[in-house]
Amino acid sequence: MLRVAEVRESAMEVNSATGRPFLIEFAADPDIIIREEMAHQDYRNVVAIEVKSGTDISNIHNRIGEAEKSHQKARRRGFTECWTVVNVSRLDMTKARSESPSTDRFYSLTELVSRQGAEYDDFRRRVMSLTAIPSPPT
């Protein structure tokens, strides 16, 4: 069961199965970061997520380029996973991967918001796995 320890304006802290706190933070660059607290004020950077919410397909490649720049910075800061969430209905994945090679995973915002389907399930499983957040009982 998800154990939320603290909710702040731009972050929430959840306790993992190991007892270590994970911070899920909303930031400027990247948009969302997930970090594990190893010791007081000592963090392991886990996931950096860029959210590109614009719906204009003609501008998606510029937005993916912006995500790439953000992910390159995140990699230099030690983030091990970089994900990009897009809000367009059609995305040429081959081109997107070539424009943002540092993106480990692309997700559809529509799929995530719907809270169902293969992309949502993959996103959820990966977050839970990388943060050791226990699954709810089935």
What are these regions (language model features)?
Residues 2-138:
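Catalytic core segments in nucleotide and nucleic-acid processing enzymes
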